[in-house]
């Protein structure tokens, strides 16, 4: 994408990447002229907030690397849009950015965009529910007799839903950890190993160091490439189908 070197091109593609990271149900509401319901989406607000915060803070962090703040803002916006929507495009090698910006990019790799969109990752809705459930558990520890309810999009969530989110996170972390351990046998540095697994499991594309936008996965061994391919399938199918397929059948 960087070969075009066209600000208009970058902004238009960046905006449309963000649009495809929005829950498609909201577009259905817009078609029905239910504008209030669409714009009141909690997940949409958090999603756009994450994009805005990441773009602005990365811009401030990398401003000294570019000839103007406008160029830094445009560059940060495109990379943030690409990573959070797991599109995988890049106009610069963000592996050369300062540490803060690189860390934000890795976090966005995990978060992903909205549920019901074209994006991979954990999904903003799951992240919201996970943190709300964690806050509820903390409140119960501090106030044992308090009765609290986790609400999402204005509706209370039952224990089955909360348990499903917790189980998904647990399985995700277990698969991530196991994959990192196995990929580390190839002997590459920690950042390369971790981000290679993260970018495959979340279907993003580029990571950091050896698998940065200007790098590739070519140097990994054949068994590791097969493992990363499995991670890509598992992440795209949201873990359960691939894990169930590889599980032994009950007798």
What is the predicted function of each stretch?
Residues 249-251:
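Positively charged, low-complexity/disordered segments
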């Amino acid at each position: 994408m960087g070969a075009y070197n066209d600000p208009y091109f970058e902004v238009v593609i960046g905006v449309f990447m963000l649009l495809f990271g929005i829950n498609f149900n909201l577009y259905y509401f817009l078609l029905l002229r239910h504008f209030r319901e669409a714009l009141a989406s909690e997940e949409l607000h958090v999603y756009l907030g994450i994009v805005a915060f990441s773009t602005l803070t990365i811009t401030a962090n990398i401003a000294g690397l570019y000839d103007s703040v406008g160029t830094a803002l445009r560059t940060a916006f495109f990379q943030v849009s690409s990573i959070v929507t797991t599109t995988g495009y890049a106009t610069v090698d963000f592996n050369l950015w300062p540490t803060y910006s690189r860390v934000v990019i890795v976090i966005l790799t995990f978060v992903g965009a909205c549920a019901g969109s074209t994006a991979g990752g954990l999904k903003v809705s799951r992240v919201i529910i996970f943190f709300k459930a964690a806050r509820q558990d903390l409140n119960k520890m501090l106030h044992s007799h308090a009765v609290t309810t986790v609400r999402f999009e204005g509706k209370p969530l039952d224990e089955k839903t909360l348990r499903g989110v917790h189980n998904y996170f647990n399985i995700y972390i277990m698969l991530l950890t196991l994959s990192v351990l196995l990929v580390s046998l190839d002997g590459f540095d920690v950042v390369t190993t971790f981000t290679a697994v993260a970018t495959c499991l979340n279907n993003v594309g580029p990571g950091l160091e050896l698998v940065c936008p200007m790098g590739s996965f070519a140097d990994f061994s054949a068994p590791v490439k097969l493992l990363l391919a499995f991670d890509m399938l598992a992440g795209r199918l949201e873990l359960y189908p691939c894990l169930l397929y590889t599980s032994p059948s009950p007798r």
